[in-house]
Amino acid sequence: MLGFVNGRLHFMESLAPGLTALQLTLRTGDRTLMESLDLALEPGEVLGILGANGAGKSTLLNVLAGLAAPAQGRVTLDGHALETLAPLTRAQRIGLLPQGDEGGFFGSVADFVALGRYPFGHDSGDLTPHLATWELTELAPRPLATLSGGERQRARLAQLAVQAPCIALLDEPLTHLDPAHQARLLAWARREADAGHSVVLTLHDPNWAACHCDRLLFLHGDGRWQLGTPADLLTPDSLEALYGSGTAALWRRNERVQPV
């Protein structure tokens, strides 16, 4: 099907089910972060987004979640323009794990985790398995503000799990987590994908990306982007182009670059 976007004729891939970006351009001030991205999130995949600080990763997730508008292009959810959908409707399908704090939340850990069911207008049900998964059972009655950074990150992840979105957007979810919980998070992402959901992670470590992502999106922060498999994109030259001279040492190439 053909249609016009920003005055240009395109195949209307945006009418496909799921979350789709068509000719998406992001800018901050007079700087173009990303230009003319076409992206369809596939059910059953983990997509990793890599780029230097300030390259537009968080901005892109906010646009995909419907919390910010692109400079050009459009985002659709099941064929509907994202901006035409009510916030609660979006939240029933799309979950966003942002960076940062909780905006002065003063309740308990259990209360915070239960907010994941707010878009559905009914009680949160049994939180026990989610609290157990993220090792929050003993912390549940404590005020969220008394937790360490890693414990709060686990509470955010539990809240997202309670929301149970079919499209999960996670902004630097490995932040503050110890190695055991980083591995647990990435295993959770794979289980979600295996259940037919779409998972998007912003990452910095190419080795995690190689092992746990089906596709990668590189954002160069100057309008350029690359989309492909880990085998296609994870090379010393591409990493130095993405992050700068000397950063190829971050990549320990392994024969196995497919998701585990």
Where are the language model's segments positioned?
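The feature captures the beta-strand-to-loop junction immediately N-terminal to the Walker
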Residues: 50-52
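Helix-to-loop junction immediately C-terminal to a conserved catalytic motif
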Residues: 65
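Conserved ABC transporter NBD signature motif
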Residues: 73-81, 90
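Conserved ABC ATPase "signature" region
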Residues: 124-140
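Conserved ABC ATPase signature
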Residues: 143-147, 151
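Catalytic Walker B motif of ABC-type/P-loop ATPase nucleotide-binding domains
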Residues: 168-172
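H-loop/switch region of ABC-family ATPase nucleotide-binding domains
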Residues: 203-204
